Amino acid sequence: MGDAIGFVVVGLGMGRNRARMVKRTEGAKLVGVADINEERAQKVAEELGCEWHTDFRTFLDRPDVHVVWVMTPSGLHADIAVPSLEAGKHVIVTKPMEVTLERADAMIETAERNKRLLLVDFDMRYLKGAWQIRQAVAEGLFGKLILLEGRLKWFRSQEYYSKSGWRGTWRYDGGGSLAN
């Protein structure tokens, strides 16, 4: 696997699923994972057979790391993306890109200045239902569309917000269910 693209996944809440995806993707190599929760980082690393650290910066000087995948709370994306881009790594961030325009712009500017790729992972676009709608529209099932509106009802209990400490906050989630 000498030509494999080396990944580090930062933030192992939902990020553990992304790490598993990288692990089973041909042409990709999961070099490591990082999380501020040492026990979680170690557990995921042991499961997937990779290195772990509590500080993502530990991976930034490594030539075998090409991509940093940021899966932290939304309001922390720039804190990880900007130094990763400065270190010459490509970056994928989960949606939303960030919680303020200024922080998102800083990420874009850093990527452009360092000639690195910055991608936003809008994972819901790949759900089966989304693809079925796309296919139906492409096949003209609804005729010529002028406007399409959709609604997604997604219930989140108070426990969902309370157990994380960051979900639903303006600082780290950008407005809760309105943004994420």
Model-derived segments and spans:
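Conserved SAM-binding strand-loop segment of SAM-dependent methyltransferases
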Residues: 49-58
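Predominantly a Rossmann-like dinucleotide-binding segment in NAD(P)-dependent oxidoreductases
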Residues: 124-180
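Beta-strand-loop-alpha-helix segment that lines the small-molecule cofactor/substrate pocket
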Residues: 67, 73-74, 78-125, 140
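N-terminal Rossmann-like dinucleotide-binding module
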Residues: 1-47
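Short, conserved SAM-binding/catalytic segment
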Residues: 43-50, 107-111
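Conserved acidic residues
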Residues: 31, 64-66
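Hydrophobic Val/Ile/Leu positions in short beta-strands of Rossmann-like dinucleotide-binding domains
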Residues: 7-11, 70, 93
